[in-house]
C-alpha cells in the first residue's frame, strides 16, 4: 500500500520555493554551482537551474556526482569487484564556489557524506549547501539539509519512493511499507 506525499504540482511548488531560498540565502547566485547526486538529484538540479534562470536571468552551471566509489555501506559480493567511480561531471572548478548539492531523499546521510568526499576530491569550495526534495529523518551522521521540499517523518519499516518524469515517466513521491 502506498500513500501519495507529493504530486506533480507539489513537486513543482517545492522546487520553485527551494530556488527562491537559494537565491535569497546566497544574495544572488553569481558564485553558485548546482551539483546533483546521481540519479534523481541530477534531474532536480536541472529543474532548479531552470527555476533560478527564470527568476534571476542567470543560467547556473550544473554538475553531477556519482558516489558509487565512495559509499561505505555497499556490500561487495566478491573481493575482486570494486565499486567504480563513473560519470562524475562537474563543468567548472568547485574551488571558491558555493556548491549546492542536490538529492531527492535524505535518509541516513551516508549518500550525502559520500558525495561530500567526492566533491572535496575535486577542489575546495567556499561553501557546500544541501538541498533535498524529501527529508525523512533517521540520520546516522550529523548531516542537515539547508533546503527541504518537505519533511516526511517515517518509521524504519516505511520507505519513500521519489519518481521524476525524466526517469520514471511521472512526478510523484509516495510512502510505502517495506517488503521483507
Swiss-Prot record:
Q: Which NCBIfam families match?
A: PRK05205.1-1, PRK05205.1-3, PRK05205.1-4, PRK05205.1-5
Positions with a binding annotation for substrate: 39-40, 103-111, 136
Q: What is its EC number?
A: 2.4.2.9
Q: What is this protein called?
A: Bifunctional protein PyrR
What's the family?
Belongs to the purine/pyrimidine phosphoribosyltransferase family. PyrR subfamily.
Q: Write out the function statement from the record.
A: Regulates transcriptional attenuation of the pyrimidine nucleotide (pyr) operon by binding in a uridine-dependent manner to specific sites on pyr mRNA. This disrupts an antiterminator hairpin in the RNA and favors formation of a downstream transcription terminator, leading to a reduced expression of downstream genes. Also displays a weak uracil phosphoribosyltransferase activity which is not physiologically significant.
PANTHER family on file: BIFUNCTIONAL PROTEIN PYRR
What's the catalysed reaction? UMP + diphosphate = 5-phospho-alpha-D-ribose 1-diphosphate + uracil
* Pfam families for this protein: Pribosyltran
Q: In Gene Ontology terms, what is a biological process of this protein? A: DNA-templated transcription termination
* InterPro entries (UniProt xref): PRibTrfase_dom, PRTase-like, PyrR, PyrR_bifunctional
Q: Which CDD domains match?
A: PRTases_typeI
Could you describe the subunit structure of this protein?
A: Homodimer and homohexamer; in equilibrium.
Q: Which superkingdom does the taxonomy of this entry point to?
A: Bacteria
Q: List, in alphabetical order, the Gene Ontology terms for molecular function in this entry.
A: RNA binding; uracil phosphoribosyltransferase activity
Q: Which UniProt keywords apply?
A: Glycosyltransferase, RNA-binding, Transcription, Transcription regulation, Transcription termination, Transferase
Amino acid at each position: 500500500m502506498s500513500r501519495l506525499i507529493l504530486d506533480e504540482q507539489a513537486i513543482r511548488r517545492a522546487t520553485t520555493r527551494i530556488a527562491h531560498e537559494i537565491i535569497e540565502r546566497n544574495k544572488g547566485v553569481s558564485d553558485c554551482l548546482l551539483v546533483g547526486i546521481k540519479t534523481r538529484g541530477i534531474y532536480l538540479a536541472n529543474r532548479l537551474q531552470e527555476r533560478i534562470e527564470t527568476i534571476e536571468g542567470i543560467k547556473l552551471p550544473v554538475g553531477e556526482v556519482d558516489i558509487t566509489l565512495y559509499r561505505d555501506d555497499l556490500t561487495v559480493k566478491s573481493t575482486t569487484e570494486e565499486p567504480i567511480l563513473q560519470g562524475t561531471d562537474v563543468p567548472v572548478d568547485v574551488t571558491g564556489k558555493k556548491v549546492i548539492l542536490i538529492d531527492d531523499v535524505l535518509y541516513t546521510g551516508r549518500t550525502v557524506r559520500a558525495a561530500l568526499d567526492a566533491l572535496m576530491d575535486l577542489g575546495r569550495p567556499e561553501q557546500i549547501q544541501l538541498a533535498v526534495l524529501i527529508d525523512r529523518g533517521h540520520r546516522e551522521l550529523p548531516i542537515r539539509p539547508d533546503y527541504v521540499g518537505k519533511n516526511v517523518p517515517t518509521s524504519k519499516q516505511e520507505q519513500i519512493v521519489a519518481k521524476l518524469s525524466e526517469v520514471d515517466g511521472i512526478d510523484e513521491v509516495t510512502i510505502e511499507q517495506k517488503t521483507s
